């Protein structure tokens, strides 16, 4: 365990004077991993670069030889205040990037001006990268430690084959626990949030141990409450853990705490329940070993007045006294707290320690639960959404991680809908998938009965704990009557029912109210409406997996239906080049090379665009490739990606000749309507004179919910988790995401919305939730409920138990959009940054003026 002193730490020489690692035969093995066997020797590119720069710290060196390296790790930590950076407002966090040249690995420091490459998940593990400008830095808190700093980088594609078992050039990088290159911190943070324990400082080795209670004086919590102000020494406490909070990281650049963590335990004896706080280095030492239900003996603690703004969770037992005037503080030092886990077999009945009580409810009981009630649930996972993120505060670098899940328990046709935030249990949060047992405690009810459709879901609280298959054995709730019934019901589930489980994709929840006036009650006035011209800026500011909901005004001028069989295709994302010079476009390569240098502002070209902006251009497509895009695998028309600027569209036709010939004309508004598309006369008049046309109508494979297949559970789970901080070799040759069946058989629609001033237009995607195999899974979330258009989601299932044919439904949606010709509408858009310059913009709801 690392201490908290600020003394310089010993480290190896920056020169890394070790023998070069011999080159080995690069023989690929299953899983896309290269194992190496000693044979020949070759010079390490990393070694040559280090030797070139170590004599000139802080001076950028442009490398004459640039070779591809592999990214093996991207790790985040708090950057402390030090006279180090020329950046006027340095970011709160910085990143160490571990690379391999096939001979050595090296941990490098990413210049903070390139942090956005990580924010956008462009620089990530498993990609090929070319570094062409570097510098050398020294960590003045450690002896002789030299650091390779990345100042100019070209990020390429993910690699199918990754070399492993290459040693670190600098052996200090292999030491445990891992330490960041800069500053005095002893640990890394989780890559995408601060709540999850990450790295090898987090111990799990604490076990119950027999304890000799002779000569131990124990005080009750109620007695301590009455006397703590007049005591200097406190007798031991014997308590049971009833609740455990998620971790709180309170690190700041100007704070010198080595491990600035805090967590709360709610503990109780026969006289009441009180809060216990674990501080700083005690959290990595104990957090992962302390679980709800354990009995603890606490000695050498301190007591202080309770923090007035914190709200304690209520005891599950209404007869238990809640002690809210004091808090118990546990520290690694001053004084060093003594914590002992007492085995259950050593407990005595006369101690009268409270039992762990759960508040399980069934799904049928949830309908009657009041707002903000606290409950526990148990059931079977039927849907597991992707991991998403939301900012804790505006302009903050800190995010919450969460995902939506469905839990069924057999008592209702409806599932529990749960917004599952990270509970500092990454081993659970990142490894849940459909058709597994799932328990979640301390959930809060969120409801609004006046909204249509009614809003009802559960969300985690600060004390929520999650358990999945394999984590239940021996826990008290397995004897709970409700839990036992649900467990028996789960055992009756069949493989046929498993086929209806779903994982990942865009999930339009929570639903917005039926009127815009109700929607506006929950939005700040200054951020209620976003102009279409501002949408691009909103998208540029989003970080990886960050989701945001906005409202825009406009006129629906066109809609195009794209069937499922053509909706999952995705072109590879572009390679990105961050350079010391201004942005330039490589016409020869046919891909957009984005350039960036240390300390410069992020260029316009570096920002995430709609997938259609960069996927294909006529300059790089062969005739054969063009035909494939135009025809698709079944020779049916599919949309051709358009340039980002409307100026480049002038002179081109919106429809192909074959599409024009099949178009049916209607009278009155000169609209063109077929079963799969419509465009208004207004669009015909304005589309070639637009100032800008934003193309975000493409649907990436990640946006499509997939039918879950147990044999591919690891692959599917990884696809819809956040990008890992360290490279994980795949098992065998992994499949592609778009090979998995969509849970939305209807496909999607591309909707064009023209701004009210007829100067800017935006294409967005509309993905109706439609499943003919499972009527109950089709949610009432229509294209336009204010039109009383309900054929997509009939209020009651047809006698056949199946929904209408997808083509018929699609035709009705197209006609419904056509009925809005020249009508001013308000569109609610859900926007999510999918990483690697891919963005998802989905139409969630349409309002017409009230």
Swiss-Prot record:
Source taxon at top rank: Eukaryota
Subcellular location: Chromosome
Record field: compositional bias (Basic and acidic residues): 590-608
Keywords: Chromosome, DNA-binding
Major site of localization recorded for this protein: nucleus
One CC-aspect GO term: replication fork
InterPro entries in the record: NA-bd_OB-fold, RADX
Polar residues composition bias: residue spans: 643-668
Gene Ontology biological process: negative regulation of double-strand break repair via homologous recombination
Signal peptide: none
Transmembrane segments: none
Region (Disordered): 1-31, 575-612, 632-671
DNA-binding annotation, residue ranges on this chain: 228-331
GO MF annotation list: single-stranded DNA binding
Pfam families: RADX (PF17659)
Known function: Single-stranded DNA-binding protein recruited to replication forks to maintain genome stability. Prevents fork collapse by antagonizing the accumulation of RAD51 at forks to ensure the proper balance of fork remodeling and protection without interfering with the capacity of cells to complete homologous recombination of double-strand breaks.
PANTHER family per record: RPA-RELATED PROTEIN RADX
UniProt protein name: RPA-related protein RADX
Biological source species: Mus musculus
């Amino acid at each position: 365990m690392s201490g908290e002193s600020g003394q310089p730490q010993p480290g190896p020489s920056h020169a890394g004077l070790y023998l070069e690692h011999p080159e080995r035969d690069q023989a690929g093995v299953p899983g896309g991993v290269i194992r190496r066997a000693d044979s020949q020797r070759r010079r390490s590119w990393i070694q040559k670069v280090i030797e070139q720069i170590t004599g000139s710290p802080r001076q950028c060196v442009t490398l004459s030889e640039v070779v591809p390296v592999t990214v093996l790790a991207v790790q985040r930590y708090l950057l402390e205040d030090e006279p180090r950076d020329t950046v006027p407002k340095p970011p709160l966090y910085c990143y160490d990037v571990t690379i391999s040249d096939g001979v050595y690995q090296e941990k490098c420091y990413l210049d903070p001006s390139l942090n956005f490459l990580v924010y956008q998940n462009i620089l990530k593990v498993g990609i090929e990268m070319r570094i062409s400008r570097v510098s050398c830095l020294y960590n003045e808190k450690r002896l002789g430690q030299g650091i390779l700093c990345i100042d100019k980088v070209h990020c390429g594609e993910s690699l199918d084959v990754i070399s492993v078992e290459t040693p670190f050039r600098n052996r200090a990088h292999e030491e445990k626990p891992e330490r960041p290159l800069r500053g005095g911190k002893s640990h890394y943070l989780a890559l995408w949030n601060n709540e999850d324990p990450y790295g090898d400082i987090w111990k799990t080795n604490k076990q119950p141990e027999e304890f000799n209670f002779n000569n131990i004086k124990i005080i009750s919590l109620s007695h301590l409450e009455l006397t703590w102000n007049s005591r200097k020494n406190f007798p031991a406490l014997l308590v049971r853990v009833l609740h455990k909070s998620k971790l709180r990281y309170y690190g700041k650049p100007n704070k010198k705490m080595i491990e600035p963590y805090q967590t709360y335990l709610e503990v109780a004896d026969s006289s009441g329940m009180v809060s216990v706080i674990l501080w700083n280095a005690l959290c990595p030492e104990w957090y992962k070993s302390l679980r709800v239900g354990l009995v603890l003996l606490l000695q050498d603690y301190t007591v202080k007045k309770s923090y007035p703004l914190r709200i304690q969770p209520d005891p599950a037992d209404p007869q238990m006294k809640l002690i809210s005037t004091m808090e118990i503080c546990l520290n690694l030092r001053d004084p060093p707290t003594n914590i002992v886990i007492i085995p259950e077999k050593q407990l005595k009945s006369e101690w009268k320690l409270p039992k762990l009580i759960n508040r399980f409810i069934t799904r049928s009981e949830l309908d009657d639960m009041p707002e903000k009630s606290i409950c526990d649930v148990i059931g079977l996972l039927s849907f597991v959404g992707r991991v998403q993120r939301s900012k804790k505060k505006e302009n903050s670098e800190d995010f919450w991680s969460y995902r939506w899940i469905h839990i069924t328990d057999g008592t209702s046709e409806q599932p529990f809908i749960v917004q599952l935030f990270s509970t500092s249990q990454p081993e659970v949060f990142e490894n849940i998938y459909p058709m597994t047992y799932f328990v979640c405690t301390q959930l809060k009810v969120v409801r609004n009965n006046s909204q249509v459709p009614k809003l009802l879901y559960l969300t985690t609280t600060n004390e929520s704990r999650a358990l999945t298959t394999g984590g239940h054995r021996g826990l008290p709730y397995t004897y709970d009557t409700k839990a036992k019934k649900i467990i028996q019901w789960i055992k009756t589930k069949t493989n046929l029912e498993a086929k209806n489980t779903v994982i990942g994709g865009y999930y339009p929840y929570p639903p917005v109210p039926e009127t815009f006036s109700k929607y506006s009650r929950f939005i700040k006035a200054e951020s209620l409406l976003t102009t279409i011209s501002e949408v691009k800026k909103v998208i540029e500011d989003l970080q990886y997996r960050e989701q945001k909901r906005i409202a825009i005004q406009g006129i629906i001028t066109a809609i195009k239906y794209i069937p499922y069989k053509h909706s999952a295709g995705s072109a590879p994302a572009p390679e990105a080049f961050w350079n010391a010079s201004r942005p330039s476009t490589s016409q020869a390569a046919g891909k957009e090379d984005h350039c960036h240098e240390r300390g410069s502002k992020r260029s316009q070209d570096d920002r995430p665009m709609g997938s259609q902006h960069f996927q294909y251009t006529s300059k790089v497509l062969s005739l054969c490739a063009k035909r494939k895009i135009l025809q698709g695998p079944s020779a049916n028309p599919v949309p051709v990606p358009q340039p980002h600027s409307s100026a480049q569209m002038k002179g081109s036709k919106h429809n192909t000749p074959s599409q024009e010939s099949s178009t049916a004309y209607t009278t009155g508004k000169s609209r063109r309507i077929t079963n799969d598309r419509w465009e208004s006369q207004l669009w015909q008049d304005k589309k070639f004179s637009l100032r800008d046309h934003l193309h975000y109508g493409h649907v990436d494979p990640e946006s499509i919910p997939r039918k879950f297949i147990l044999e591919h559970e690891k692959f599917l789970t990884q696809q819809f988790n956040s990008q890992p901080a360290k490279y994980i070799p795949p098992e065998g040759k992994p499949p592609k995401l778009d090979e998995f069946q969509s849970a939305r058989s209807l496909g999607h629609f591309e909707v064009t919305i023209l701004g009210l001033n007829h100067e800017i237009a935006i294409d967005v995607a509309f993905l109706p939730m439609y499943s003919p195999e499972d009527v109950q899974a089709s949610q009432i979330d229509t294209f336009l409920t204010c039109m009383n258009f309900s054929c997509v989601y009939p209020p009651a299932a047809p006698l056949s138990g199946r929904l209408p044919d997808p083509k018929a439904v699609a035709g009705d949606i197209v006609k419904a959009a056509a009925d809005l010709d020249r009508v001013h509408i308000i569109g609610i858009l859900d926007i999510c940054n999918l990483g690697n310059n891919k963005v998802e913009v989905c139409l969630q709801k349409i309002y017409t003026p009230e």
